[in-house]
Amino acid sequence: MKELIQEERAIVWYLSHHREATSNQMLESDSPYAELLSPYFQPESSDLQSWMEFPYEQNKKYPEQKIYGTSAGIHVRSKSESMIVYLLYDYKIPFRYECALELGQVTAYPDFTIRHPKTGKLFIWEHFGMMDDPTYRRNALSKLQLYMEHGWIPSVNLLLTYETKEYPLDMAYVEGVIKDYFVK
């Protein structure tokens, strides 16, 4: 009987001191629980869908080079980018193509800006498709340096794929990247 009385007191104390909070309130950015809980809760998919569809500043350079149509209804510059779009779209991973990203005084346009479908975490994906070309390779390394100077870390929040004529991008590899980072 003594244990029941102690248990009742504990319940009464808990109820009198417990703050009502919804799971959404616990996940708000100023909540002490947000960092702890966010990996385990999926933001509302409608929010991610809205983010994907919301107008954004895109790269306006060389629109005539966007010749490859995709299943997502956008045009991209290369077959490899169309492969990435196909798989992102197929796995329902929210993304933007060539979305403006401010890096200090420079505006970059990463190939893909991606939101993790469960956590909402932001990733960027650069596909470097002409690594045979020395000028292209130099520019790619310069871009990579700029990203790292602004907190975009390879394999953490910056995904990188490369190809040459001898070693083209492989669909199975792209699918593996998507599964490793976004489908767990």
Predicted regions and their residues:
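Alpha-helical scaffold elements within enzyme catalytic domains, especially in hydrolases
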Residues: 3, 87, 91-93, 146-149
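Solvent-exposed, charged helical/coil patches
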Residues: 24-93
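Active-site metal-binding core of divalent-cation-utilizing nuclease and nuclease-like domains
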Residues: 74-76, 89, 93-119
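Short beta-strand-loop-alpha-helix junction that forms the active-site gateway
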Residues: 109, 113-143
